[in-house]
Design a protein with these regions (language model features):
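Conserved radical SAM core fold
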Residues: 72, 109, 134-137, 155-173, ...
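Auxiliary Fe-S-binding modules of radical SAM enzymes
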Residues: 1-21, 189-299
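Alpha-helix N-cap and loop-to-helix initiation/capping positions
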Residues: 80, 107, 167-175, 212, ...
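Non-cysteine beta-strand/loop elements that form the S-adenosyl-L-methionine
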Residues: 145-160, 233-241
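Anionic-ligand binding region
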Residues: 164-196
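Hydrophobic faces of well-ordered beta-strands that scaffold small-molecule active sites
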Residues: 52, 100, 128-130, 151-153, ...
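Alpha-helix-loop-beta-strand connector modules within alpha/beta enzyme cores
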Residues: 116-127, 178-186, 260-266
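Conserved Radical SAM active-site core
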Residues: 24-146, 150, 159-161
Length: 299
């Protein structure tokens, strides 16, 4: 599979087993930037003690406004074996993580599934979260089938021209829509533990409002509301957009934060469409530190 890689929708077909790096910037060796408890996910995922986040190096999307550019562009990452990855999962469980949270994992899907199988054999019992961009191939998602309990996925754009401008992926809307269907097929209806309030199964769809992007965000909400399972997933509306250094020259429209009135309008619009199983962020979210230090903690 990795000899002519088609794990992501870019389908670059490089031989990652021979050491070639794909569009994702990675060859076949798993590389991590951090493995530690994280408290900034949605409440049913972070809970009280935190989510056991494992940050994988590389990404198939490369959004111009990415807050994790140091790892998405492959400049940060430490090589780990499959056996070490399995041990990292078990170590997160030992730290009382509520779940194993795989951040941008799809380009390492076969290796991750092997590590999860080894960890399960050694006592891993936590639910597994696939925390991804939404730009996912059905091939990669089907590798995760039966191994992932929760999909925490972005749905970034409904307008192809915006997807092309900011992520060089004009096919993002249709790819993400098909991926969402597959995610729901695998894990089904959103379900929290009635005793703890922690998420056990289901899909959480994140959408980040971008500056000047309200009409696109409205279109994303319409697309989600039209899904036959719309009331059986959760939507997380995010206001934490932060301008990244250097972005303002090529993309001046992204140089400022979002308009709070736009965010309020987005919340109202989603609720009017019946997307009432949803999360929203407080006004100070963009000033808070959602970006951990990629310092190889836990790796």
């Amino acid at each position: 599979m990795l000899e002519s890689c088609t794990l992501c929708p870019r389908s670059c077909k490089v031989n990652r087993l021979a050491g070639a790096a794909g569009y994702c910037t990675q060859d076949a060796t798993v590389r991590l930037a951090r493995a530690a408890l994280h408290h900034w996910e949605e409440p049913p995922i972070s809970g009280d003690t935190g989510s056991g986040t494992v940050f994988f190096s590389g990404c198939s999307l490369h959004c111009v406004y990415c807050q994790n550019q140091d790892i998405s562009n492959g400049s940060i990452g430490r090589e780990v074996s499959i056996e070490r990855l399995a041990q990292i999962f078990l170590e997160q469980q030992g730290r009382d993580a509520h779940n194993i949270n795989l951040v941008t994992p799809s380009h390492f899907a076969p290796q991750i599934v092997e590590a999860l199988s080894r960890a399960r054999a050694q006592g891993l019992k936590l639910p597994v979260v696939c925390n991804c961009s939404g730009y996912e191939s059905l091939e990669a998602l089907r590798i995760f089938d039966g191994h992932v309990d929760i999909y925490l996925t972005d749905f970034k754009y409904a307008f192809p021209e915006r997807a092309e401008r900011y992520s060089r992926a004009s096919d993002y809307p249709q790819v993400a829509s098909a991926a969402l269907d597959e995610m729901y097929r695998q894990v089904g209806e959103y379900r929290e533990d009635p005793q703890t309030g922690l998420l056990e199964k289901g899909v959480v769809v994140r959408h980040l409002l971008l500056p000047g992007g309200l009409s696109d965000s409205f279109a994303v909400m319409r697309l989600l509301a039209a899904k036959p399972y719309a009331r059986k997933i959760c939507v997380s509306l995010m206001s934490q957009y932060t301008p990244m250094p250097g972005c303002e020259q090529a993309f001046p429209e992204l140089a400022e934060g979002i308009d709070p009135q736009d965010y309020d309008a987005l919340i109202d619009y989603a609720l009017d469409l019946g997307l009432d199983n949803s999360f929203c962020q407080e006004g100070e979210a963009a000033s808070e530190s959602f970006i951990p230090a990629f310092d190889y903690e836990g790796v």
